[in-house]
Structures are given as C-alpha cells and as structure tokens.
C-alpha cells in the first residue's frame, strides 16, 4: 500500500498537541516525528497509507483552526509516496521507538 508523510507546523505547543491528537484519532497513521522548530513553532509528522494521511491531515488542520488556544498553522505539507532519499535524510522513518504504535 502506498505510504505518505504528512507534516504540520504550528505556532505554540497547544496547537501542535491538538493537531497530533486529531491526526492520530482521525486515521490509521503513526506519529513519527515531533520537535520544536524555532521561535515557538512546533512541527509534527505522521506516516501511513496515502488516503489515511490525507484524512488525518484534514483532521489535524481543522483541530488547530477550531481551537480556542490562539495557535495558528504556520505551514503544512503532504508527501505521497516519498522517495527513499527523502526517507533516508529526513527524520520521518519508522523507528524502533514508534514501531509498537505502527498501524
């Protein structure tokens, strides 16, 4: 099944938490990366089947837009069928740390 990577960058921690929560509850995806980007921006990345990542990203974006926490979406992107070079270089590979949560 073709895989995809979805990334959301937000301003503020509560917003990225809301996005991650909605994405994981909204589809069969795995959280593969989370970190502080810069100046109060946070980034979260998911992986899973293309259709599930598309659905989960919509849910995550909606959660940030609907939250009353004052956060905002800085950027977001979906990479359907990422090439091996992307997976080798960016920190979005399935790791041992997330293996038990993989759907």
Swiss-Prot record:
Q: Which residue ranges does the record assign to the BMC domain? A: 4-91
Q: Name one GO cellular component term.
A: carboxysome
Primary location recorded for the protein, binned into one broad class: other
- Annotated membrane-spanning segments are none
Q: Which Pfam families match?
A: BMC (PF00936)
A molecular function GO annotation? structural constituent of carboxysome shell
Q: Which UniProt keywords apply?
A: Bacterial microcompartment, Carbon dioxide fixation, Carboxysome, Photosynthesis
Q: Where in the cell is it found?
A: Carboxysome
Entry-linked PROSITE patterns: BMC_1, BMC_2
Show the Gene3D superfamilies listed in the entry. 3.30.70.1710
Q: Give an example GO biological process.
A: carbon fixation
* Family per similarity comment: Belongs to the bacterial microcompartments protein family. CcmK subfamily.
Q: Note the subunit structure.
A: Forms mixed heterohexamers with CcmK4, probably with 1:5 CcmK3:CcmK4 stoichiometry. Only very weak interactions with CcmK1 and CcmK2 were seen. Bulky residues in the pore region probably preclude the formation of homohexamers by this subunit.
Q: Which PANTHER family match?
A: CARBOXYSOME SHELL PROTEIN CCMK4, PROPANEDIOL UTILIZATION PROTEIN PDUA
Function per UniProt = A probably minor shell protein component of the carboxysome, a polyhedral inclusion where RuBisCO (ribulose bisphosphate carboxylase, rbcL-rbcS) is sequestered. This subunit probably does not form homohexamers.
Put simply, this protein is called Carboxysome shell protein CcmK3
Q: Which gene encodes it?
A: ccmK3
